[in-house]
Amino acid sequence: MSLPYRHVVILTGAGISAESGIQTFRAQDGLWENHRIEDVATPEGFQRDPDMVLEFYNQRRRKLLSDAIQPNPAHLALGKLEKELQGSVTVITQNIDNLHERGGSQNIIHMHGELLKARCPESNQTVEQKEDIRHGDLCHCCQMPAQMRPHIVWFGEMPLRMGDIYAALEQADLFVSIGTSGVVYPAAGFVHDARMHGAHTIEINLEPSAVESEFAEKRYGKASIEVPRLVEEILAAQARAKESAA
């Protein structure tokens, strides 16, 4: 890697958190931890059985807050990159955990929401949420109190902060996708957007994604190994450029 990059955009999917013990959605059978997606990740599922949906996310939240779930070397490397790069690093994540924050990243866009927040469906106001959400927990920020729900973007709902995402992609000179399947849009199209704006594109995954042909460079292996390796290459290129300019 020869060029020093100034505006790095990272897209992360379930693969980066899987190595930390967070189970992923299995697209081949439509199940998430043995639950049908239609039951636990749609507005209709929440309307049908709010108790079951709330408990599903309560269990995920408890696990995330347990000592068993920790950021892995890939999260830590991205935190280091943001701290040491002489430029900007934007992490766009499809994950709902807080492992990027705990790994040291600060400029994070949670396009699918956050497990450690709850949202009022009437006002869209969000609050920090580390305790269980129960059926009957009402929001009192609006005139008509509504049942609080997990701050999660369910299937059929619009991803969050799309304007900020596209603005970052327009500025990117390096776009890296880590642990994504490439089948969920609009995220699967980000590599095309970044490439059209001139960014170098890299895919890091266990196996080729559905959009692997869009990437100029592919690195296949564990995120915990490949991401730290890439970060060191980026920072080394920056150091060489600084030395040559001195």
Swiss-Prot record:
Substrate binds at Y57, R60. Binds 1 zinc ion per subunit. It is found in: Cytoplasm. Keywords: Cytoplasm, Metal-binding, NAD, Transferase, Zinc. Disulfide bonds: none annotated. GO terms for molecular function: histone deacetylase activity, NAD-dependent; NAD+ binding; protein-malonyllysine demalonylase activity; protein-succinyllysine desuccinylase activity; zinc ion binding. Its cofactor is Zn(2+). Residues 1-237 form the Deacetylase sirtuin-type domain. GO terms for cellular component: cytoplasm. Its EC number is 2.3.1.286. It catalyses: N(6)-acetyl-L-lysyl-[protein] + NAD(+) + H2O = 2''-O-acetyl-ADP-D-ribose + nicotinamide + L-lysyl-[protein]; N(6)-succinyl-L-lysyl-[protein] + NAD(+) + H2O = 2''-O-succinyl-ADP-D-ribose + nicotinamide + L-lysyl-[protein]. Pfam families: SIR2 (PF02146). This is NAD-dependent protein deacylase. The lineage of its organism: Bacteria, Pseudomonadati, Pseudomonadota, Gammaproteobacteria, Vibrionales.
